[in-house]
């Protein structure tokens, strides 16, 4: 029998788009001028494509009027709101680079991000939840409080010249966003802007170090958003409910640019995720699609008033960020009417999506795999020497194509570590290609446990343990062992106290003996990055430290 190797290449009869985001927006506004473009329920905003395009022009003129130029970095630090979308599209229209800042950042993370990429102008909310953004900025640069003029000169943030506040500015040194966004439009020659120009800097989640600035071009993200929509058959008739954050590629690429390229309506139910607001928005706005991570769908399904909402208009949507448990997927498809729900996988550095399940994928494919490779993307699974493995064998997943980032801003050595000489982006994920061409993610390369010479993939054990009726969430990692090199440790969030003997009994006969956790700890929460990823490095260090304390 012929062995098929783990190389994949996505094809499509639909060509790549070769245009800037600004040009695409203008096209869509001309094609669907009176179609609803943006609905932001918590702000009472409802704009057509014609209105959105005109508002983008005015804000773009305001940014140019400050003295900002093509290639300048403009940061935005705010939760989901209409202004976020305006800033995204206005900066793209005039060739500036949007720097997406996590609303959960604290002062050290914010200062690192602003300094790393040299942000010249920062657009910020006054506050969000428990964070007072303006006070946090003053903590980094105290001169902000006393500056007389609107052009700043800050010792700690030498590149930052303007801070533009959403709402009434707290101090004279801060500019008013509303005034800036009301600037009379100016003629602007956008022919100098190329689809290959950088348009966005997304910060990696930094599970193993300080976040890096993945630099993405118009070509990267406009095509990725477009093909995410193509694979779920999006059109101008679709109305997308967007509870995912805009600062992340899920919101600004997979949702916003998907809608911009298809003329679909963007509907934001709230400034941060609220399952009740999502359900209400779907019913009131007759949404046809809903995006989210699995935990969002679980929260929506678990809402006490779930059965009271009419979700019958839903057809499709995207789940990403983690594999979805089979029972949850079944409920999403049946109780939420999302028969065409799609699973997406990728990474910030690939704009982000590289794999997606198709509309005809069966249940097993949707819950066990991340689907097949995206159009115009190459992928391969390789061993430690870079040799392509046969299908069915696990190795590192590499991706190449239009979606691969330009690099990490100002960090050429980090870029070379991630993208090899052949243009392949090293994902750091362990994957295997099934015989049918669908891909399974089995873990992280750095998270792989080696016990007595056996390679153990934490994701495999996690996917098994999550089926335990009393386990809510689980994270598996390796801890040092004198004889075996490493042993398996599981941290669980459980509905009741579970001891290691009970867990081992549950596992015995159902998974290989060497995969059964030797150590178990019940916890209330896991250490997380600001983007919601589990910090296994920190968990491992805490576990080792606690074991040392317990042995004394």
What are these regions (language model features)?
Residues 17, 26, 37-89, 106-111, ...:
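Conserved AMP-binding/adenylate-forming core of the ANL superfamily
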Residues 46-50, 199-223:
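Conserved AMP-binding A3 loop
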Residues 66, 94-178, 495-496:
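Structural core segment of the AMP-binding/adenylate-forming
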Residues 1-47, 51-66, 70, 115-118, ...:
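N-lobe entry segment of adenylate-forming
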Residues 222-239, 249-289, 303:
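Conserved AMP-binding/adenylation subdomain of ANL enzymes
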Residues 33-36, 156-160, 165, 171, ...:
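Conserved pre-ATP/AMP-binding loop-to-beta segment of ANL
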């Amino acid at each position: 029998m012929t062995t098929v190797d783990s190389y994949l290449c996505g094809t499509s009869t639909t060509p790549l788009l070769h245009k800037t985001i600004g040009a695409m927006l203008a096209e869509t506004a001309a094609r669907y001028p009176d179609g609803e473009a943006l609905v932001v329920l918590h702000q009472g905003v409802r704009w057509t494509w014609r209105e959105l395009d005109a508002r983008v022009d005015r804000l773009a003129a305001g940014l140019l009027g400050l003295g900002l130029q093509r290639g300048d970095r403009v940061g935005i630090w705010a939760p989901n709101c209409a202004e976020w979308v305006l800033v995204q599209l206005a900066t793209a229209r005039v060739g500036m680079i949007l720097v997406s800042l996590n609303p959960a950042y604290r002062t050290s993370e914010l200062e690192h991000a602003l300094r790393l990429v040299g942000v010249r102008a920062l657009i910020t909310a006054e506050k969000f939840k428990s964070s007072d953004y303006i006070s946090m900025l003053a903590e980094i640069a105290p001169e902000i409080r006393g500056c007389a003029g609107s052009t700043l000169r800050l010792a700690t943030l030498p590149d930052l010249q303007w801070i533009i506040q959403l709402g009434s500015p707290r101090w004279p040194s801060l500019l008013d966003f509303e005034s800036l966004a009301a600037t009379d439009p100016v003629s602007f020659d956008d022919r100098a802007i190329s689809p290959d120009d950088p348009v966005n800097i997304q910060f990696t989640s930094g599970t193993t170090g300080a976040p890096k600035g993945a630099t993405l071009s118009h070509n990267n993200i406009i095509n990725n958003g477009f093909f995410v929509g193509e694979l779920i058959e999006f059109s101008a008739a679709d109305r997308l409910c967007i509870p995912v954050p805009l600062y992340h590629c899920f919101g600004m690429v997979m949702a916003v640019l998907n809608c911009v390229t298809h003329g679909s309506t963007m509907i934001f139910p709230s400034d941060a995720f609220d399952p009740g607001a999502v359900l209400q928005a779907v019913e009131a706005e007759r949404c046809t699609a809903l995006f989210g991570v699995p935990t969002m769908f679980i929260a929506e399904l678990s809402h006490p008033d779930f059965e009271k909402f009419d979700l019958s208009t839903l057809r499709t949507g995207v789940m990403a960020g983690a594999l979805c448990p089979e029972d949850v997927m079944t409920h999403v498809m049946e109780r939420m009417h999302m028969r065409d729900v799609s699973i997406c996988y990728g990474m910030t550095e690939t704009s982000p999506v590289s794999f997606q399940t198709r509309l005809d994928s069966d249940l097993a494919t949707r819950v066990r795999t991340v689907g097949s490779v995206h159009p115009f993307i190459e992928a391969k699974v390789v061993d430690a020497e870079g040799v392509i493995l046969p299908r069915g064998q696990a190795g590192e997943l590499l991706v190449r194509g239009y979606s691969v980032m330009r690099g990490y801003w100002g960090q050429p050595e980090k870029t070379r570590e991630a993208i090899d000489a052949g243009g392949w982006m090293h994902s750091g994920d362990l994957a295997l290609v099934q015989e049918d061409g669908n891909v399974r993610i089995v873990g992280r390369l750095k998270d792989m446990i080696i016990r007595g010479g056996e390679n153990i993939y934490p994701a495999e054990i996690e996917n098994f343990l999550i089926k335990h009726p009393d386990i809510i969430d689980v994270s598996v990692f390796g801890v040092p062992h004198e004889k075996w090199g490493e042993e398996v440790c599981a941290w669980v969030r459980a509905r009741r106290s579970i001891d290691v003997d009970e867990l081992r009994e549950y596992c015995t006969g159902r998974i290989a003996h060497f995969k059964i956790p030797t150590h178990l700890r019940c916890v209330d929460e896991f250490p997380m990055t600001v983007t919601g990823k589990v910090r296994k490095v920190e968990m491992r260090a805490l576990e080792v430290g606690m074991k040392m304390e317990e042995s004394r």
